[in-house]
Structure formats: structure tokens, C-alpha cells
Swiss-Prot record:
GO terms for molecular function: mechanosensitive monoatomic ion channel activity. Keywords: Cell inner membrane, Cell membrane, Ion channel, Ion transport, Membrane, Transmembrane, Transmembrane helix, Transport. InterPro entries: Mechanosensitive_channel_CS, MS_channel, MSC/AndL, MscL_channel. Channel that opens in response to stretch forces in the membrane lipid bilayer. May participate in the regulation of osmotic pressure changes within the cell. The chain crosses the membrane at residues 16-36, 89-109. The keyword Glycosyltransferase does not apply. Belongs to the MscL family. This is Large-conductance mechanosensitive channel. It is found in: Cell inner membrane. Homopentamer. GO terms for cellular component: plasma membrane. It comes from Paraburkholderia xenovorans (strain LB400). It comes from the Bacteria.
Length: 148
């Protein structure tokens, strides 16, 4: 079998195509979640914490070079200048992104699993008692009631 034919067979399998579609949709979905966190959740968190902007929270670890022209209070300016900074604010934002994404995926999987479950039918009525059992019960009852 030629290598091209093997690759074509591999690439056109359902699992590979499903994975490709999942990656593309996941990338688009990640953009949506990032926007939700950045534009909707973090402003509310900032408002609740008195205007705290997490994206600019950091601890400077290295010295500022003499040629530095930016603001020493700006995380991005310090990073651009090559100063070592511990950007815990960015980490908090990424962590919130991850938690929201994980929760939404959990809800989606739960929803899909519920769709896959067969509808739980109401308990079926017991089958009618067979005639031979009814006859045996009659015989038993008549023997109980007959004098000995």
C-alpha cells in the first residue's frame, strides 16, 4: 500500500475528522470564553474589589534598566523592557478562563449524556397470571376450604 493511500485512509477516518472539527470549534469557543472573562466577569470582579485591575497585578523581580522609558507601574511596559516580573494578575485571569471553560464543557457533556440515555419508561404492568397458576390456586383454595 502506498504511503499516500495510507495517509488518505488515515486522514479520512471519522475520528480524525471529528477531532479536526472539535479543535476548530474549540478555538472559536475559547475566544468567546476569553471575551466573557475579560469583558464581562473581570470588570464586575474589579468593581466588587474597588476598581482592582487584575491584568496589571505583578511583582517586579528584576532591576529596571537605565534606558527604560515606560511606566514602572505597567506590567506590559516592564515585560517589553525585559524586566523579570511575576504576573500573578494575568494568571488569575487565565485561571478564571479555564474554570469557566471547564464548567461549560462539563455542562455540555452532561447535556449530551442525558440525550444519549434512553428515556426511562414507566414501570410495565406485570404480565397476567398464567391460567395454570390460576387453576392451581383454585385447587389450593378449595382444598383449604373442604372439611377433612
Amino acid at each position: 500500500m502506498s504511503m499516500v493511500k495510507e495517509f488518505k485512509e488515515f486522514a479520512l477516518k471519522g475520528n480524525v475528522m471529528d477531532l479536526a472539527v472539535g479543535v476548530i470549534i474549540g478555538g472559536a469557543f475559547s475566544t468567546i470564553v476569553n471575551s466573557i472573562v475579560k469583558d464581562l466577569i473581570m470588570p464586575v470582579v474589579g468593581l466588587a474589589t474597588g476598581g482592582l485591575d487584575f491584568s496589571n497585578k505583578f511583582i517586579r523581580l528584576g532591576a529596571i534598566p537605565p534606558s527604560f522609558k515606560g511606566s514602572p507601574e505597567s506590567y506590559k511596559d516592564l515585560q517589553t523592557a525585559g524586566v523579570a516580573v511575576f504576573g500573578y494578575g494575568s494568571f488569575i485571569t487565565v485561571l478564571i478562563n479555564f474554570l469557566i471553560l471547564a464548567f461549560i464543557i462539563f455542562l455540555m457533556v452532561k447535556f449530551i449524556n442525558n440525550l444519549r440515555k434512553p428515556a426511562e419508561a414507566a414501570p410495565a404492568e406485570p404480565p397476567p397470571t398464567p391460567e395454570d397458576v390460576l387453576l392451581l390456586r383454585e385447587i389450593r383454595d378449595s382444598l383449604k376450604n373442604s372439611p377433612r
